[in-house]
Structures are given as C-alpha cells and as structure tokens.
UniProtKB/Swiss-Prot annotation:
Its main location: cytoplasm. It is found in: Cytoplasm, Cytosol; Membrane; Endosome; Late endosome membrane. Gene3D superfamilies: 6.10.140.1230. The keyword ATP-binding does not apply. This is Charged multivesicular body protein 3. InterPro entries: Snf7_fam. One of its GO terms (cellular component) is multivesicular body. The record marks R215 as: Interaction with STAMBP. It comes from Danio rerio. It is a lipid-anchor. Residues 59-64, 168-169 are annotated as: Important for autoinhibitory function.
Length: 221
C-alpha cells in the first residue's frame, strides 16, 4: 500500500513477467486436457472395434460421432495453444519496446488472441483476469462479448458428420465398417460379423456407452 491507502502500480516489466507465467501455467492446463481427451479416445476406439465384431452398427456410429467431436475439441485446444504462444512472443516484444520507449504499447495481435482465448472454458477465468490487467496497462482495448460464437457448430457437424463417420469407422475397423464414398448403411449383416449380443449384454453396453459419452462431454466442456 502507498500513501493514503492507495495501491502502488507494479512496474510494467513485472506485469509482463507475471502475465507470461500465468499464460505458461494455462498452457500446461491445455496440455493435460488434450491428453485426457486422447486417453478417452483410445477407449472409444476399442469399444468401436468390439461393437463392430458384434455387428452393432448403431453403436459404432454413435461412438464415431463422439470421436469426431473429440477431435474437433482437440483441434480447438491446439489452436488455443498457438494463440497463447503468440501472446508470449508479443510479451517479449513488449519488453524490448519498454527498454527503448519506457512504456508499453497497444497490440492488435494480443487483442485478437485474447478475444479468442477468453472463450475457451478451460482457461476462461484466467484469460478474463489477464485481459482486464492488459486493458488497465494499455496494451489492449476493452473487448466486446461475441455472442454469435459457436452458433454454426451444430450445423457444420451435421453436414460433415456422415463422411467423417465413414472415414473413422473404415480406419478403426481396418475396412470392416464404413467406406470412403458410401455411407454406413451398407454394413455387413451382424451375423456375418459376430454373434448377436444377449439382452443383458446390450444393457451393460448401453450403460458403458453412456458413461463414455458423459466422460468425453465433461472433458470437452
């Protein structure tokens, strides 16, 4: 505390170092999230192979769609890491500017990156706090909430889903299910692939699928 109870402003260099540390910490959070989703993906792949052997094409399609959503979530997380690296690089540049000009400068690059990063649920709270600190320091301007973000995700998912489902099933089952140009409606007869599951087994499998879907949804949210 300074005189009359006022908090003294931190030197710009200290602010930049603090921001860089926080960003690196959040990058590790993103890395863990990616690894967790990838581990669940491996379980889904095994479940698809098992379901394919039993001729359960509906189960395979459901799980393949989960794989698609997970891959998209991972791609978004990797994109976030790239943006965070961009901010870190800009912070280094700010230190160079500070040494020459004695003050921090506005950065449109940091502004754009932070606008995207505040929308990532895993790191949202930290990125919002950092944005406020950067606005106060004069590096970025006040950001407006983008309420339109993500509105087209479901439509895009539906348009691309069928082709992607075929591709994933073809790859995971080594060609037993799914075909590059055609849809998964021409799957082999279940009897030809494997024995039909008993009602008890089907109930257990449904529970396992629901649990798997819940875990993946939790990791992606």
């Amino acid at each position: 505390m300074g005189l009359f109870g006022k908090t003294q402003e931190k030197p710009p260099k200290d602010l930049i170092n603090e921001w860089s540390l926080k960003i690196r910490k959040e990058m590790r959070v993103i890395d863990r999230q990616i690894r967790d989703i990838q581990r669940e993906e491996e379980k889904v792949k095994r479940s698809i192979k098992d379901a394919a052997k039993k001729g359960q094409k509906d189960v395979c399609i459901i799980l393949a769609k989960e794989m698609i959503q997970s891959k998209r979530a991972i791609n978004k997380l990797y994109a976030s890491k790239a943006q965070m690296n961009s901010v870190l690089l800009s912070m280094k540049n700010q230190l160079s500017v500070l040494r020459v000009a004695g003050a921090l400068q506005k950065s449109t690059e940091v502004m754009k990156a932070m606008q995207s990063l505040v929308k990532i649920p895993e790191i949202q709270a930290t990125m919002r706090d950092l944005s406020k600190e950067m606005m106060k320091a004069g590096i970025i301007e006040e950001m407006l909430e983008d309420t339109l973000e993500g509105m087209d995700d479901e439509e895009e998912m539906e348009e691309a889903a069928e082709a992607e489902v075929d591709k994933i099933l073809f790859e995971i089952t080594a060609g037993a299910l799914g075909k590059a140009p055609s849809k998964v409606t021409d799957l082999p007869d279940p009897v030809a692939i494997g024995a039909t599951a008993a009602p008890e087994e089907e109930s257990e499998e449904e529970e396992e699928i629901e649990e798997m879907q819940s875990r993946l949804a939790a990791l992606r949210s």
